Amino acid sequence: MSGAAAAAARALPKAVTFVTGNAKKLEEVRAILGSSIPFQSLKLDLPELQGEPEDISKEKARMAASQVNGPVLVEDTCLCFNALKGLPGPYIKWFLEKTGHEGLNNLLLAYEDKSAFAMCIFSLALGPGEEPMTFVGKTAGKIVPARGPADFGWDPVFQPDGFDQTYAEMPKSVKNQISHRGKALALVKEHFAAANYKVQNDGSA
């Protein structure tokens, strides 16, 4: 493992670009990463892809690295209903836009099984032509009628196992410790600590 980490050590031409146009998501990522990884954020118009979640995330990272001409971190989030064999999955954003929180609950009306899991996939591409690395976090829970502030996606309808609160009702510090995003970013932080990347650009560009 140490040999692999040493082999991965390299200089990055500039800080990692986290690709997002979602202010709430950016706020959460900044809270979780703190100053552990130097990154900047940028909204890019990447095409919406279909396929398996990890494949989608990797392909987005390849496209983003080509556009940015540098290292990028992209995120894809899934909400998977076990009764529906994993749907809505990576298409949760569109399901939520079309049906709202009540509609997500209605998808499971005919099923006793309300269990679900939230999955977050971060893909890191160190530059154009580089094969992306993926970091996956999962949190199991269940789908419930919406509770809590409705300002961050499907948080009000997802109640993680072992808790009486939905994501939306939780203090941010608690959610960030147990969430799918928090778990995936913990793996990203581990990778950066082991790889010991050095950013060449001091930010003057």
Curated annotation (Swiss-Prot):
Query: Which amino acids does the record list as binding Mg(2+)?
Result: 48
Residues that bind ITP: 20-25, 60, 76-77, 93, 152-155, 175, 180-181
Kindly report, in one word, the top-level EC class recorded for this enzyme: hydrolase
Enzyme Commission (EC) number: 3.6.1.66
MF terms per GO, please?
dITP diphosphatase activity; ITP diphosphatase activity; metal ion binding; nucleoside triphosphate diphosphatase activity; nucleotide binding; XTP diphosphatase activity
- Please provide the record's keywords in A-Z order: Cytoplasm, Hydrolase, Magnesium, Manganese, Metal-binding, Nucleotide metabolism, Nucleotide-binding
Reaction catalysed by this chain? ITP + H2O = IMP + diphosphate + H(+); dITP + H2O = dIMP + diphosphate + H(+); XTP + H2O = XMP + diphosphate + H(+)
Q: Name one GO cellular component term.
A: cytoplasm
According to the lineage, what is the superkingdom? Eukaryota
**What InterPro entries does the record point to?**
ITPase, ITPase-like_fam, RdgB/HAM1
Coiled coil located at which positions?
none
Q: Can you tell me which family this protein belongs to?
A: Belongs to the HAM1 NTPase family.
Which PANTHER family does the UniProt entry name for this protein? Answer: INOSINE TRIPHOSPHATE PYROPHOSPHATASE (PTHR11067:SF9), INOSINE TRIPHOSPHATE PYROPHOSPHATASE/HAM1 PROTEIN (PTHR11067)
Q: How does it assemble?
A: Homodimer.
Protein's recorded name: Inosine triphosphate pyrophosphatase
**Species this protein is from:** Oryza sativa subsp. japonica (Rice)
Q: From which lineage does this chain's organism come?
A: Eukaryota, Viridiplantae, Streptophyta, Embryophyta, Tracheophyta
